[in-house]
Swiss-Prot record:
Side of membrane Cytoplasmic, spans: 1-15, 60-66, 118-122, 176-185
Gene: calJ
Regulation: The calcium-release activity is mediated by two factors: pH and transmembrane ion gradient. It was proposed, based on an MD simulation, that the conserved aspartyl dyad (Asp-171-Asp-195) regulates Ca(2+) binding, pH sensing, and the channel pore opening and closing, and that protonation of Asp-171 probably weakens its interaction with Arg-60, facilitating the opening of the channel. Another study using nanodiscs suggests that Asp-171 is not a pH sensor regulating the pore dynamics; instead, it is only involved in the gating of calcium ions.
Name under which the protein is recorded: pH-sensitive calcium channel
This protein's GO CC annotations: membrane; plasma membrane
Keywords for this protein: Calcium, Calcium transport, Cell membrane, Ion transport, Membrane, Transmembrane, Transmembrane helix, Transport
Source organism: Bacillus subtilis (strain 168)
Membrane topology label: Multi-pass membrane protein
Annotated PANTHER family: BAX INHIBITOR-RELATED, PROTEIN LIFEGUARD 4
Length: 214
């Protein structure tokens, strides 16, 4: 019986990771297409992206997040990611983008493996991580209207890197310890995608500021 449950959890984990990888591929296509999208459309697309995140949280309670929603979100977020990637590539060089992506991949792989194999249930981290993300969001909104200086943005990026690294650890750990049904596969893959992309953005900002200060 235990062996059957273990195999079932392994199967669910593999399917979640497969969907996650597919979202990254779709986001990459969106990133490529982003270079052809008029600047005037970036703000509406960014608003759509935020609206979809909020909608995903609401739909998650009803277990109504489907594959089409996740893939559409990945595509839109890939498009809106282009200006960020382009900005840091232009001021610090393309190698900074590769450095940030490589670091994100390594951190995700290492912490994801640790979280998935850890016997301890990390569900106690949920409230802390939620507060941390909300705080980061508030600071991010403040930065739009009153831009932070380089030192403050560096600190913001470091904190963001820590928070989303912990989210990777937490989410993979919860996939192991929670009873994940098939209808939750899309939303769990979306959670991993958001962890990965936000970690990448924070590392890109960190390396970009570091390189521009040299």
């Amino acid at each position: 019986m235990q062996a059957t449950v273990h195999e079932s959890k392994q199967s669910i984990m593999q399917r979640i990771l497969t969907v996650f990888v597919f979202t990254l591929l779709i986001a990459t296509v969106g990133l490529f297409i982003g270079q052809f999208v008029p600047v005037a459309l970036m703000l509406p697309l960014s608003i759509l992206e935020v609206a979809m995140i909020i909608l995903a949280f609401w739909m998650r309670r009803r277990k109504a997040v489907g594959y089409a929603f996740v893939y559409t979100f990945a595509f839109v977020s890939g498009i809106t990611l282009f200006p960020i990637v382009s900005h840091y590539a232009s001021i610090a060089g393309a190698y900074v983008v590769l450095e940030a992506f490589g670091s994100t991949f390594v951190i995700f792989a290492v912490l994801g493996t640790i979280g998935a194999k850890m016997k301890k249930d990390l569900s106690f981290l949920w409230s802390f991580l939620l507060v941390a993300v909300l705080a980061l969001a508030v600071v991010g909104i403040f930065n739009i209207f009153s831009p932070l200086n380089s030192a403050a943005m560096m600190a913001y990026s470091v904190i963001g890197t820590i928070v989303f690294s912990l989210y990777i650890l937490y989410d993979l750990n919860q996939i192991k310890h929670r009873h994940i049904t098939e209808d939750l596969i899309p939303v769990m893959a979306l959670s991993l995608y958001l962890d990965f992309i936000n970690l990448f953005i924070n590392l890109l900002r960190f390396f970009g500021i570091l390189s521009s200060d040299d």
